[in-house]
């Protein structure tokens, strides 16, 4: 009898110690609320689509009469990439033979050449090019690197093999000097040829991972992401290997940090609330961005984002949703529409009574980044984002997802996220 009283008392104490746990509904109630939200969202989307809802194709630059002023790339076959490279080289050879010198016409990826298109809700690249001549001290080295990259990709096309960006760098370390230089030219070449980077058969090393209610085929092998342990399944760097996605999830949870991902994976959060959990462990990589978009488009699931409450967390969210300026030429393939900002939001710091010792003062650079983001069109489009960013800049406070651990290591999965889902508290 004493043991029963002790157990009851310990449960009561736990409820008192965990802020807001007492107002949580049961998992079944929260699940039903989510089902209702998803159902109404689908109906609303169908209604808003009107006559165009019968077509599954998203808006394109051509639909907005922007295809002549903006540049976008497409997936090309290896033979097409090979042909494009050979065409470029033939043009250069003719120019040299005519005595006009040797130069590449390279699309400008400068920040001033980026354009946010509200109708598409993503950043695109304006169609403006610059010359990269060989007979110029300022550009001779970059022109040489461009030529070398083109030759290497041509070899990949002939052999029909994939290499990593690191492999590419090590083919000529003395010339490239630093991988950031070969990576940048690789993006230039992709843009020049009018193809996605994956069309070049150059991939990044595996970085992102996924766990939860998802089954898909990886190069013909069926993968069940509920049986991959805490570490989850590494996201294949070649999206062409991925197919036949199946899921009974209600949403996709996009997590910024590996630590938060591991907490949710170990607690098997996806079994309490059917979901798919994915992370790129920080900055979004191309493979994770492609994989997230594929899940969103094929499974038709809402995407909820869990990021740090700082300008960089929101920046990461915006890269997934609106694209990066560095790869705006491929934003059609790399962006995931309508990602909801679940947390951690600046207003959550007071709402969830995050202790002062778990909050961090923003640096001058943090504040500048926050103010710069307030000037971005994709932020201005969302009043909720503007309000949260203004609050962050005003209070000069930031916090990581791990700040929730001050209430207990499992507070994230036991209270914070369930309550967010219960209240449908996202922007």
Swiss-Prot record:
Catalytic activity: ATP-dependent breakage, passage and rejoining of double-stranded DNA
E.C. number(s) listed in UniProt: 5.6.2.2
Positions bound to Mg(2+): 256, 308
Cofactor section: Mg(2+)
Domain (Topo IIA-type catalytic) ranges: 76-209
Class of enzymatic activity (EC top level): isomerase
Keywords for this protein: DNA-binding, Isomerase, Magnesium, Metal-binding, Nucleotide-binding, Nucleus, Topoisomerase
Bilayer-spanning residue ranges: none
Biological processes, Gene Ontology terms: DNA topological change; epidermal cell fate specification
Annotated catalytic residues: 170
Subcellular location: Nucleus
InterPro entries associated with the record: Spo11/TopoVI_A, Spo11/TopoVI_A_N, Spo11/TopoVI_A_sf, TopoVI_A, TOPRIM_Topo6A/Spo11, WH-like_DNA-bd_sf
Phenotype when the gene is knocked out: Plants are defective in cell elongation and show a severe dwarf phenotype.
Predominant subcellular localization, coarse grouping: nucleus
Tissue-specific expression: Highly expressed in leaves, stems, flowers and seedlings.
GO CC terms in record: chromosome; DNA topoisomerase type II (double strand cut, ATP-hydrolyzing) complex; nucleus
HAMAP family: Top6A (MF_00132)
Subunit structure: Homodimer. Heterotetramer of two TOP6A and two TOP6B subunits. Interacts with BIN4 and RHL1.
Function statement: Component of the DNA topoisomerase VI involved in chromatin organization and progression of endoreduplication cycles. Relaxes both positive and negative superturns and exhibits a strong decatenase activity. Involved in cell-elongation processes.
Family stated for the protein in its record: Belongs to the TOP6A family.
Protein name per UniProt: DNA topoisomerase 6 subunit A
Origin species: Arabidopsis thaliana (Mouse-ear cress)
Gene name per UniProt: TOP6A
């Amino acid at each position: 009898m004493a043991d029963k009283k002790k157990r009851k008392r310990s449960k009561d104490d736990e409820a008192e110690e965990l802020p807001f746990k007492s107002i949580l509904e049961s998992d079944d109630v929260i699940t039903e609320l989510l089902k209702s939200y998803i159902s109404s969202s689908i109906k609303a989307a169908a209604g808003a689509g009107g006559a165009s809802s019968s077509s599954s194709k998203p808006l394109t630059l051509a639909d907005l009469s922007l295809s002549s002023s903006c540049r976008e790339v497409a997936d090309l076959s290896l033979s097409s990439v090979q042909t494009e490279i050979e065409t470029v080289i033939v043009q250069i050879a003719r120019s040299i033979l005519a005595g006009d010198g040797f130069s590449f016409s390279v699309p400008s990826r400068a920040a001033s050449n980026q354009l946010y298109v509200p109708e598409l809700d993503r950043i695109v690249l304006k169609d403006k090019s610059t010359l990269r001549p060989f007979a110029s001290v300022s550009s001779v080295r970059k022109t040489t690197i461009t030529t070398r990259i083109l030759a290497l990709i041509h070899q990949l096309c002939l052999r029909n093999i994939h290499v990593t960006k690191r492999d590419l760098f090590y083919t000529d370390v003395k010339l490239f000097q630093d991988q950031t230089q070969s990576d940048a030219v690789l993006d230039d070449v992709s843009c020049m040829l009018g193809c996605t980077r994956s069309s070049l058969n150059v991939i990044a090393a595996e970085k992102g991972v996924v766990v939860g209610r998802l089954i898909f085929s990886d190069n013909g092998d069926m993968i069940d992401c509920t049986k991959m342990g805490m570490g989850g399944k590494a996201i294949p760097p070649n999206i062409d290997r991925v197919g036949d996605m199946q899921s009974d999830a209600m949403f996709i949870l996009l997590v910024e940090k590996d630590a938060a991902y591991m907490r949710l994976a170990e607690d098997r959060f996806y079994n309490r609330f059917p979901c798919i959990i994915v992370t790129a462990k920080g900055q979004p990589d191309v493979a994770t961005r492609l994989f997230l978009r594929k899940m969103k488009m094929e499974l038709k699931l809402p995407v909820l984002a869990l990021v740090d409450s700082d300008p960089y967390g929101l920046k990461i969210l915006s890269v997934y949703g609106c694209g990066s300026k560095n790869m705006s030429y491929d934003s059609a393939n790399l962006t995931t529409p309508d990602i909801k900002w679940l947390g951690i939001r600046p207003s959550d710091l007071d709402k969830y009574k995050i202790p002062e010792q778990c909050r961090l003062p923003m640096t001058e650079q943090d504040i500048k980044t926050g103010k710069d983001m307030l000037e971005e069109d994709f932020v201005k489009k969302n009043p909720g984002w503007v309000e949260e960013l203004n609050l962050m800049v005003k209070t000069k406070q930031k916090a990581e997802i791990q700040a929730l651990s001050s209430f207990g290591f499992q507070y994230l999965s036991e209270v914070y996220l369930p309550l967010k889902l219960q209240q449908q508290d996202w922007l």
